């Protein structure tokens, strides 16, 4: 029988950082339901993605003078995106529209979008080079955000934009719908991970796109 041990060399894991963010705007007209998103575009200047899941709260039911059971509420995925800038393609997701070259207006309908970003996994031997996780988020909708413009002074700071993002889950065969999928590079075969990244980030022949969970699972589970 195995004896438990703690903090062995190589097992001291941690997570940090966020980078390689990609925006996938929703298509105006979806022809193929398995490919509802437009080509991805790189999101430069990302500083933070703060995941804020909610729900999954118990409601106690009592009967016969005892606690009968707990009913769990549905869980939802939400996040806050923080960045120094954003791709031009995000403007329609943020409620802006162009009325002429160089002129935009706000308070317009907000387009849904998908998102991918990477977080780093480190350990005591390889530091931040141990691995990473790719996060895929579906059915995102950004809420209006505050922008604080201040005078330039002797302590210059760049404005950090921030958006509250809600999500709508998508179907996953054999499971409940989800809006958040995570791929762990330390557990997925290298060849399959490369194939997935070619889909997400594009190749010389194909535009980057956001695959739905069923396609990701089929790719990773396939031979």
Description of each model-found segment:
Residues 144-223:
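Mixed-charge, glycine-accented linear interaction segment located at domain edges/termini
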Residues 1-51:
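Polar/acidic, low-complexity leader/linker segments enriched in S/T/G and N/D
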Residues 3-8, 12, 28-34, 83, ...:
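Short, charge-rich amphipathic segments
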Residues 19-25, 29-32, 46, 115, ...:
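Generic hydrophobic, helix-prone segments enriched in Leu/Val/Ile
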Residues 44-48, 139, 162:
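Extracellular/lumenal ectodomain signal focusing on beta-strand-rich modules
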Residues 48-55, 137:
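Membrane-targeting and insertion segments and their boundary/processing signals
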Residues 51-52, 58-90, 155-170:
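Oligomerization/assembly interface segments of phage tail-like spikes and tubes
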Residues 67-143:
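Structured, beta-strand-rich domain cores
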């Amino acid at each position: 029988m195995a004896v438990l041990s703690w903090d062995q060399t190589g097992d001291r894991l941690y997570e940090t950082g966020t980078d390689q963010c990609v925006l996938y705007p929703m298509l105006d007209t979806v022809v193929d339901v398995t490919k509802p998103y437009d080509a991805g575009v790189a999101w430069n200047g990302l500083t933070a993605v703060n995941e804020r899941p909610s729900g999954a709260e118990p409601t106690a039911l009592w009967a016969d003078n005892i606690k009968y059971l707990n009913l769990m509420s549905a869980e939802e995925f939400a996040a806050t995106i923080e960045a120094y800038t954003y791709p031009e393609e995000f403007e329609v997701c943020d409620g802006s529209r162009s009325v002429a070259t160089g002129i935009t207006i706000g308070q317009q309908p907000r387009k849904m979008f998908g998102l991918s970003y990477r977080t780093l996994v480190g350990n005591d031997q390889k530091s931040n080079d141990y691995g990473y996780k790719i996060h895929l988020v579906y059915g995102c909708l950004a809420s209006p955000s505050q922008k604080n413009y201040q005078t330039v002074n002797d302590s210059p700071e760049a404005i950090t934009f921030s958006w509250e993002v809600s999500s709508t889950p998508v179907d996953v065969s054999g499971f409940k719908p989800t809006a958040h999928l995570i791929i762990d590079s330390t557990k997925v075969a290298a060849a399959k991970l490369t194939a997935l990244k070619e889909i997400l980030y594009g190749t010389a022949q194909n535009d980057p796109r956001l695959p739905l969970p069923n396609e990701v699972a089929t790719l990773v589970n396939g031979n």
